[in-house]
C-alpha cells in the first residue's frame, strides 16, 4: 500500500469534461433558481408594506376590462390637428392606460404609468406632450429616454405620425450613429428628442451650443429596463442638466425598489396609473411546449417552420451567437429569416426590422432586445428556441403575438436541461401549458440529416461573422450600454 507523506496532496477522482460541464450547469441553474426565489420573497415583502397616505391618495389602479374614462379621443378637447393625426392612425378608442393617464397628463400632472408592452403607452405620453407643444412651439420641448436603440426609433415613429399635421420636428439620438450628423440635427432645433441615455449625455457634454435648460417634458420609457441596464448614474447626470420645473412621465412594466427611488428623485406628487402588475398572458394566445432532445433542437425548430410556412414568426434565442447561427441555419435551409441582436450595426438592425415589418422576411430571430416596446404588428407565432431565465421575460416574449384582439400562437422548445426552469414559468403565469405531439421518428430522423449538415455550415459562417465583427469594433468606445 502506498503511504502518503504529510506534505502530499490527496488527489480527487478525475471527472470527464462532460460531467464537469454538467455539474457547472446544474450549479448555475440552482443559483439562478435560488436568486429568483429570493427576489420573489423580497417583492412579496415590499408589496405587503403599508403605503404612505400621500401615495395611496394618488394611485389610480386600472384593470384592462374596466370601463374607460373616455370612449373617443374627441372628448379630450385636443387641437384639431392632433385629432386628425389620431384618426389617420386609426386609433378607434383609447386603451386602458391611455384612458387613465391622458386626462391626468393634460392637467399637467406627473405620471407613473405601469403597463406591459402593447398597451398603447407610447401614445399615452406622446399625445399630452404634443397637445402642450401646440401652444408653445419651442425647441427642445420634450426629451424621451429609452433603453434600446430600436425602441427609441419606434417612439420617434409614433411622435412623427401623431405630429404629422402639426409640423413637429423630432430627432433620434442613439449609439452607433455619427455624432456629427446628430449634432447637425440638434442645431435644427427639434421639438422632441428621443435618445438612449449614454448618447444624449455625450451631446450634453460635447456638442457646442446644445443644452436642455428650456426642457418642459421629460419621459423615461421602460424605466425598469433603464435601471436593469445600470443606466442609473447616467440618469443622475441627466437630471442635473434639465430644469427642476418640468413635467415628468415614468413608464415601466413593473414597480421595483429602484423605480420607487427614481420616482422620488425625479417626479413631483405623481399620479400612478397601473394597468396590470401581474405576469399575465393574453386570453387569445394559444401557448404550448415541445419536449425535445438537446441534440435534435434545431431539427424540431425546422419542423415547426415547415408547419408554419407563410406565417409571421419571431424566434427568441438567449445569446447573440445563437441568434446569428440560427438565422444562418434557416437561410441555408431556404427560409426567409433575418437576425436582430447587438453584434449587428445599427443599419443592419434597422434593416432586419424593416424587412420583417414589410413582409420581405417572414422570420425574425432575436435576442430579448426585441421583446419589449417594439412596434411589430401582426406576428402570428412566437417560438422560444431558448427558454428565458424568468417568467417576466417569457411574458414579454410571447406578448409579441396575440395583440390588439388578434389570436396568436407560442411554442417553447424545452430540453431536459430546461424543464425545471420551464415549470417555474408555468407556476408563475398560473397556467399548465399543453405538450404538442412530436413528429414521427422516421420523419424527424430524415430531416435531421439535412439539418445537421446545414448546421455545420452555419457554425462556420457564424465564426466568420464574429471574427469580422471583432475586427470592425476594435478601438471603438460606445458609451451606450443595452441588452443584447
From Swiss-Prot:
Keywords: ATP-binding, Helicase, Hydrolase, Nucleotide-binding, Nucleus, Ribosome biogenesis, RNA-binding, rRNA processing. It is found in: Nucleus. One of its GO terms (biological process) is rRNA processing. Signal peptide: none annotated. Residues 102-273 form the Helicase ATP-binding domain. GO terms for molecular function: ATP binding; ATP hydrolysis activity; RNA binding; RNA helicase activity. GO terms for cellular component: cytosol; nucleus. Its EC number is 3.6.4.13. The keyword Lipid metabolism does not apply. Residues 18-54, 475-484 have a biased composition (Basic and acidic residues). Residues 300-444 form the Helicase C-terminal domain. It comes from the Eukaryota. A motif (Q motif) lies at residues 71-99. Its main location: nucleus. Residues 1-10 have a biased composition (Polar residues). The keyword Nucleus applies. Belongs to the DEAD box helicase family. DDX47/RRP3 subfamily. This is ATP-dependent rRNA helicase RRP3. It comes from Scheffersomyces stipitis (strain ATCC 58785 / CBS 6054 / NBRC 10063 / NRRL Y-11545).
